[in-house]
A protein has these predicted regions:
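Solvent-exposed beta-hairpin/edge-strand motifs
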Residues: 98-112
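Surface-exposed, flexible loop/turn segments at secondary-structure boundaries
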Residues: 17, 92, 110-112
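Acidic surface patches and DE-rich sequence motifs
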Residues: 32, 66, 77, 103-107, ...
Length: 135
C-alpha cells in the first residue's frame, strides 16, 4: 500500500450484520454477530500491537539470500524502530547479514521470537505474513 500511496484503510463493518443484510454481506465483520472476536480481529490486533499507530515507508533489511516469490515491504515506526513485512508462497529462508538482533512476529499466531546471530540472521519465510522488528 505504501507503493500505491494510500493514506487510510476503511473497514466495511466492525461486526457481522444480522438478517437484514444480504447473505453476501452478513459475515464481513471483525466480530461475530454476538460481538465475539473472530480470528481476523485477533490477527489485526496483533498486527497493530507491533506496527504502532503510524508507519513511514522504510527499507527492508539488506539480504544476501531470499526465497523465490518473496513479498517484502519495509517500514519505520514512529519510535524509529524498523519493520520488515514479508511472506512467500514458496517459503524458504532469508539471510540478513547486517542484523545481529531482531524480534520476529507472527500476527496470525500471536507469537514473537527473539533472534540473535553472529553472522547475521537467518529467518524462515512462511506463506503467511511475518514482521521483523529491529533497531
Amino acid at each position: 500500500m505504501s507503493a500505491l500511496d494510500f493514506d487510510k484503510i476503511f473497514l466495511f463493518t466492525l461486526s457481522d450484520l444480522d438478517q437484514r443484510a444480504s447473505v453476501r454481506d452478513q459475515y464481513y465483520g471483525l466480530l461475530d454477530i454476538n460481538a465475539n472476536p473472530k480470528p481476523v480481529y485477533t490477527a489485526l490486533k496483533n498486527f497493530l500491537d507491533v506496527s504502532g499507530p503510524s508507519l513511514s515507508p522504510g527499507d527492508p533489511p539488506l539480504a544476501d539470500q531470499l526465497p523465490d516469490g518473496l513479498f517484502s515491504i519495509g517500514w519505520t515506526r514512529a519510535d524509529g524502530h524498523k519493520l520488515w513485512f514479508f511472506w512467500s508462497a514458496a517459503g524458504g529462508n532469508a539471510h540478513l547479514p547486517g542484523l545481529a538482533n531482531a524480534t520476529l512476529y507472527d500476527p496470525l499466531l500471536g507469537t514473537q521470537t527473539p533472534l540473535t546471530g553472529t553472522n547475521g540472521l537467518t529467518v524462515t519465510v512462511k506463506p503467511t505474513l511475518q514482521i521483523l522488528l529491529w533497531d
